[in-house]
UniProtKB/Swiss-Prot annotation:
The active site is at S101. Catalyzes the conversion of glucosamine-6-phosphate to glucosamine-1-phosphate. This is Phosphoglucosamine mutase. It catalyses: alpha-D-glucosamine 1-phosphate = D-glucosamine 6-phosphate. GO terms for cellular component: cytosol. The lineage of its organism: Bacteria, Bacillati, Bacillota, Bacilli, Lactobacillales. Keywords: Isomerase, Magnesium, Metal-binding, Phosphoprotein.
């Protein structure tokens, strides 16, 4: 991570940390870095979610892009993965999404995609940061015909919707409940599933600029659980603010998280011989039950650090086509370059239709172990050295010996906060409490500050 760019672009409280002035500079400098080798007039797609600050930041960002001669195609409100898809398929120099994903409405973010549809690598972000910190802006200042042209491009959303529909199968009146989080999916999810023939009940579809992710969406699926049961839906599909995540709800109102979604899709692809190297890429936070289910099916796994960017890096490096996170990021590389909640939803309903199985039947093949996560406040300098403290090492080893392979412990520093995270999984909640409490007592005694 750099000074401005975190693990998923530039984020902060809108108008205080992520200001219009910074958005202008990101447009100007980011656009220049990503298009400086173009032989023709560069084209950049810009999308946003429904936050009240979105249009303010979009106006500033677009002005910055236009100021270095870039033609800007405004996509309006649509999903983050739609920007990635359009960049890759329509030959743009880059794409920019204005969103803070699952964060509350007061936050916003700016995320860049390169011409290949992938998020920027560290080197490109470093180039942009160097220009942001330079004492003087020495970039070209074209005038007249050298300036960029602004084009409204609402048809981009229709193309994305049509593409997702083309990857699915007719649902023939299947009852589907949608929760679009009052966010980006509110402009597309209803249309996609209506075109597939589903009978719909939709919540979280009335954005007002302030209610994105507010008690709705993938981070708050409780309302959808009730709607699924009340409407008799076969499945509920909850997206986050920018629709790069999916959390599902089965016909009984039970949560089906990212681990289970990956397993269902992975097994389906494996049985068809379409799972690249018969491997799923996941992170260290995936549940032990998920790993055991993969082992039972003979499906391999590659494990990365937490964060969808690390999952994508491993997929690109090794040629895998399915990966994701427990939180609901699922990357289907055969279809798109980034996590796509609506794409995952289309594939999940397709599998239900083709197999004739309910979502609860498909998900029951993964027995999720009880999991507990505790965050302990520590000094930043100590969070990296925690595993070198003898008493902490000893208690972790002791707990792992007691587990005898039927559980898992993960102690890791937070990437963004002065926290040490202690997580355990075991067959019962009582065992999980025992393992986590025992370890956290030692950690607090040795290095904790709370």
């Amino acid at each position: 991570m750099g000074k401005y760019f975190g693990t998923d672009g530039v984020r902060g409280e809108a108008n205080l940390e992520l200001t219009p002035e910074l958005a202008f500079k990101l447009g100007r400098f980011g656009g220049y870095v990503l298009s400086q080798h173009e032989t023709e007039a560069p084209k950049v797609f810009v999308g946003r979610d429904t936050r009240i600050s979105g249009e303010m930041l979009e106006s500033a960002l677009v002005a910055g892009l236009l100021s270095v001669g870039i033609h800007v195609y405004k996509l309006g409100v649509l999903a983050t993965p739609a920007v990635a898809y359009l960049v890759e398929t329509e030959g743009a120099s880059a794409g920019v999404m204005i969103s803070a994903s699952h964060n509350p409405a007061l936050d916003n973010g700016i995320k860049f995609f390169g011409g290949d549809g992938f998020k920027l690598d560290d080197e490109k972000e470093a180039e942009i940061e160097a220009l942001l910190d330079a004492e003087e802006d020495t970039l070209p200042r074209p005038s007249a015909e050298g300036l960029g042209i602004l084009v409204d491009y609402p048809e981009g959303l229709r193309k994305y919707e049509g593409y997702l529909v083309s990857t699915g199968t007719p649902l023939d009146g299947m009852k589907v409940a949608l929760d679009t989080a009052n966010g980006a999916a509110s402009t597309s999810a209803r249309q996609i599933f209506a075109d597939l023939g589903a009978q719909l009940t939709v919540i979280g579809e009335t954005p007002d600029g302030l209610n994105i992710n507010l008690n709705v969406g993938s981070t708050h699926p409780e309302a959808l659980q009730e709607v699924v049961k009340e409407s008799g839906s076969a499945i509920g599909l909850a997206f986050d603010g920018d629709s790069d995540r999916l959390i599902a709800v089965d016909e009984n109102g039970d949560i089906v998280d990212g681990d289970k979604i990956m397993y269902i899709i992975g097994k389906y692809l494996s049985e068809k011989g379409q799972l690249a190297q018969n491997t799923i890429v996941t992170t260290v936070m995936s549940n032990l039950g998920f790993h055991k289910a993969l082992n039972r099916e003979g499906i391999n796994k590659a494990v990365t650090a937490v964060g969808d960017r690390y999952v994508v890096e491993e997929m690109r490096k090794s040629g895998y086509n399915l990966g994701g996170e427990q939180s609901g990021h699922v990357i289907l590389m055969d279809y798109n370059t980034t996590g796509d909640g609506q794409l995952s939803a289309v594939q999940l309903t397709k599998i239900m239709k083709e197999t004739g199985k309910s979502l609860s039947e498909l998900a029951a093949e993964v027995t999720i172990y009880p999991q507990k996560l505790v965050n302990i406040r520590v000094e930043n300098v100590m969070k990296e050295k925690a595993m070198e403290v003898p008493a902490i090492k000893a208690i972790i080893e002791k707990m792992e010996e007691e587990m005898a392979g039927n559980g898992r412990i993960l102690v890791r520093p937070s990437g963004t906060e002065p926290l040490l995270r202690v997580m355990a999984e075991a067959p019962t909640t009582e065992e999980v409490d025992y393992y986590v409490d025992t370890i956290t007592d030692v950690v607090r005694a040795e290095i904790g500050i709370d």
